[in-house]
């Protein structure tokens, strides 16, 4: 199947909410080796975000059930086996995405925007791996995630407006990493607040095309700040996960 057909099929799969098919098509497009257009890049990102998202939420539900189940319960082994099955699927998806990023996408990125987009993606997928990892494996995965986010963050500060949706989305996810993975609410709040304040200060630079995306992410940054500051103030509040991009 040629590139045009693969992209048409990916769009069709998206409309049908068949994200596994969508991801398969966009993986094939990526493996053809050419730099992706913005549209192709977004199709790839949406496909895998949905594919991995289903596993992440399933893993959380099963883990929660596992924690509430008595260890002597006969169902315990069944629950554990099922969690491990979902974990295995999640790891496989993340590994596939990280291979595409390292082999094709980051190497082929010719502009700062694409580079930041893909490095953010790399940080995200290592973060998803860190959510289910333990021991030395978790430590290494966290380091990989932080390294990718930091590299993307440094480029975005140098090359992009504070109101750019990719820069804002990166700040959002990097702050979630600090809060949820490193358990560092102070740094998470500082990063999110700085990104929000810098964007507010330069609202006049908002591109008309990206106005909706930028303001939505700014709202998510503010929502997370509200949630995290109420958490740290010790209010009766579930440690709900922060919104991410």
Swiss-Prot record:
Example GO biological process: protein localization
GO cellular component: cytoplasm
Sites annotated Interaction with phosphoserine on interacting protein: 56, 127
SMART domains per record: 14_3_3
InterPro entries listed in its UniProt record: 14-3-3 (IPR000308), 14-3-3_CS (IPR023409), 14-3-3_dom_sf (IPR036815), 14-3-3_domain (IPR023410), 14-3-3_theta (IPR042584)
CDD domains: 14-3-3_theta (cd10023)
Keywords for this protein: Cytoplasm
Location of this chain's protein in the cell: Cytoplasm
Statement: the UniProt record of this protein carries the keyword Transmembrane: no
Pfam families named in the record: 14-3-3 (PF00244)
UniProt function note: Adapter protein implicated in the regulation of a large spectrum of both general and specialized signaling pathways. Binds to a large number of partners, usually by recognition of a phosphoserine or phosphothreonine motif. Binding generally results in the modulation of the activity of the binding partner.
Subunit structure: Homodimer, and heterodimer with other family members.
Family from the record: Belongs to the 14-3-3 family.
Protein name: 14-3-3 protein theta
Species this chain originates from: Gallus gallus (Chicken)
């Amino acid at each position: 199947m040629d590139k045009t057909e693969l992209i048409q099929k990916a769009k069709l799969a998206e409309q049908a909410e068949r994200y596994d098919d969508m991801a398969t098509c966009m993986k094939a497009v990526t493996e053809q080796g050419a730099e992706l257009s913005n549209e192709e890049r977004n199709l790839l990102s949406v496909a895998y975000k949905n594919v991995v998202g289903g596993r992440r939420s399933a893993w959380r539900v099963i883990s929660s059930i596992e924690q509430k189940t008595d260890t002597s319960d006969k169902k315990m082994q069944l629950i554990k086996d099922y969690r491990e099955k979902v974990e295995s699927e999640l790891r496989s998806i993340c590994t596939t995405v990280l291979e595409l990023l390292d082999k094709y996408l980051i190497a082929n990125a010719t502009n700062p925007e694409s580079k930041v987009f893909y490095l953010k993606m790399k940080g995200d997928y290592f973060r998803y791996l860190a959510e289910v990892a333990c021991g030395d494996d978790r430590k290494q995965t966290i380091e990989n995630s932080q390294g990718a986010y930091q590299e993307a963050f440094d480029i975005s500060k140098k090359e992009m407006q504070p109101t750019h949706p990719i820069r804002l989305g990166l700040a959002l996810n990097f702050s979630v990493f600090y809060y949820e993975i490193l358990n560092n609410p102070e740094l998470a709040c500082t990063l999110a607040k700085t990104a929000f304040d810098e964007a507010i200060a330069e609202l006049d630079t908002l591109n008309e095309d990206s106005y909706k995306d930028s303001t939505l992410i700014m709202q998510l940054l503010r929502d997370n700040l509200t949630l995290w500051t109420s958490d740290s103030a010790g209010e009766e509040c579930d440690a709900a996960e922060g919104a991410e991009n």
